[in-house]
Amino acid sequence: MKKSYSGVTRTSSGRLRRLADPTGPALKRSFEVEEIEPPNSTPPRRVQTPLLRATVASSSQKFQDLGVKNSEPAARLVDSLSQRSPKPSLRRVELAGAKAPEPMSRRTEISIDISSKQVESTASAAGPSRFGLKRAEVLGHKTPEPVPRRTEITIVKPQESVLRRVETPASKIPEGSAVPATDAAPKRVEIQVPKPAEAPNCPLPSQTLENSEAPMSQLQSRLEPRPSVAEVPYRNQEDSEVTPSCVGDMADNPRDAMLKQAPASRNEKAPMEFGYVGIDSILEQMRRKAMKQGFEFNIMVVGQSGLGKSTLINTLFKSKISRKSVQPTSEERIPKTIEIKSITHDIEEKGVRMKLTVIDTPGFGDHINNENCWQPIMKFINDQYEKYLQEEVNINRKKRIPDTRVHCCLYFIPATGHSLRPLDIEFMKRLSKVVNIVPVIAKADTLTLEERVYFKQRITADLLSNGIDVYPQKEFDEDAEDRLVNEKFREMIPFAVVGSDHEYQVNGKRILGRKTKWGTIEVENTTHCEFAYLRDLLIRTHMQNIKDITSNIHFEAYRVKRLNEGNSAMANGIEKEPEAQEM
């Protein structure tokens, strides 16, 4: 009599073979076919057929269409047999089969254990029992991508204790041995197929099959000659790049459907915010329009000859914009009238184009009698306003009116170290009403630090006492932020500046400055002079504000006055030419 222990059995050659643990992770790679003997025969024997691959290969074409469903009729037939058989016996059935020879030759071993250790001896024959799933191993000749599996199905039947081995050749299995399991029965079979270690993590869902009772004759006729072959479907590694391969219908699994749709959802753009309108894009639209049209800026420099007006303009824009005055002859040293010159230069920086116009006033303050020397400058400013006004009132006016209005006037104060001259006070008092005046102390490097501080204090006091409102004006501050920024600039007025268009190397850096015996004066160094603050005010922070005040304040005042004069002249019936006079 052959003894059988849990997990150990003896083969026909006398060697002990350890059965695979139902819950163990290892996969078997041996192919085994076991034949079943009649219940009344001698103790069970086991035949190991290691060379069955050649025999199975000849009949493997017949099992190509067999699937997992072939294991279901075998479980159902064995269940019916165990219910009707009077002999208490424990049977273990291992069935083998092969799949299609195209990708590989495979074989599945199904072990059915019927033991009375798991239930009570008085339990009813029709009572439900659990079927535990053992590991499945499929072995065959294959490419490196597929992974073999081996399936073991253990069926426990109450009131049976004898272990019997059933071995049947695979050549006797017909193709039509599948019986659909659709009827309800108290027994359930749970099948769990673990995935390979290298495959993606995709567990097989538990499948519950309910079997119905079958006649004994039908059971014996189907069980002995035709053992079912449980073929575990698999997919190649090449086919499982997007979604992991699992046993069962992947299309019916909602979780797999979500995995298939996940990559597509990542490529989709995030939807725009529901409340977003797009008003902030107006800034980009204005920027593109301004880049196409460019900007215009007109600056006037007023002061005596030799104060460095042209040099300062060239230093501001770092280019040869303003030409230096040519030394006149002895007959031409004293000009009869003030000559106003305009120089236009196109500047482009980082794709931004600006049309810069510099208005120079040579001869201002160079006369012995400087009375009313400010009138030619006042007339020039008003003429530009009149020209712009006539373009506006035309019936067919231009789409874009050329802007020649003076936006800013730099008034150069000689570095005397005392106070403002009467000419300086009279000029700034009259022109501050029609143009933005920015007073500067020319050639401030001729003053010591103490002299410069004292001179600036005296100039500030003279401006306040004479009611001269220079730029930036307090009344034009729009909000608290503008007021805070403008107050810092007002404290620096007048700006003590030094101009130079010569470059020097200081500590490996290129600078604009003036070189002397005791050192180099750096133009853009705020500890040496206030040129950097003047540049920021005119170009980097307040250029657009200067243009807006010119258009909305000074030009608007001139336009109102001219329209009032025109209405009064029409009322009196007198037509007279407009005169450039103080406003």
UniProtKB/Swiss-Prot annotation:
Annotated ranges, domain Septin-type G: 293-565
The UniProt annotation places GTP binding at 303-310, 337, 363, 443-451, 499, 514
- GO molecular function (one): GTP binding
Which residue positions does Phosphotyrosine occur at?
276
InterPro entries listed in its UniProt record: G_SEPTIN_dom, P-loop_NTPase, Septin
Q: Mind telling me which CDD domains this protein's record contains?
A: CDC_Septin (cd01850)
Tissue expression per record? Expressed in all tissues examined except muscle. Isoforms are differentially expressed in testes, kidney, liver, heart, spleen and brain.
Q: Name one GO cellular component term.
A: intercellular bridge
Instruction: Give residue numbers for the modification (Phosphoserine).
Output: 30, 82, 85, 89, 325, 330
Q: Where are the annotated segments for G1 motif?
A: 303-310
Specify whether GTP-binding is a keyword of the entry: yes
Q: Which SUPFAM superfamilies match?
A: P-loop containing nucleoside triphosphate hydrolases
Q: Where is this region: G3 motif?
A: 360-363
Coiled-coil portions: none
Entry-annotated residues carrying N-acetylmethionine: 1
Bias category Polar residues: which stretches? 1-14, 204-221
**One of the Pfam families matching this protein, by short name:** Septin
Q: Name one GO biological process term.
A: positive regulation of non-motile cilium assembly
Q: Which domain of life is it from?
A: Eukaryota
Region of interest: G4 motif: 442-445
* Residues carrying Phosphothreonine: 42, 49, 143
Question: What function is annotated for this protein?
Answer: Filament-forming cytoskeletal GTPase. May play a role in cytokinesis (Potential).
What the record says about family reads: Belongs to the TRAFAC class TrmE-Era-EngA-EngB-Septin-like GTPase superfamily. Septin GTPase family.
Q: How does it assemble?
A: Septins polymerize into heterooligomeric protein complexes that form filaments, and associate with cellular membranes, actin filaments, and microtubules. GTPase activity is required for filament formation. Interacts with SEPTIN2, SEPTIN6, SEPTIN7, SEPTIN11 and SEPTIN14. Interacts with RTKN and ARHGEF18.
Disease the record associates with this protein: Putative proto-oncogene involved in T-cell lymphomagenesis. May play a role in leukemogenesis.
Report the protein name in the record. Septin-9
Write down the species: Mus musculus (Mouse)
Read off the lineage from the record: Eukaryota, Metazoa, Chordata, Craniata, Vertebrata
- Its encoding gene is what? Septin9
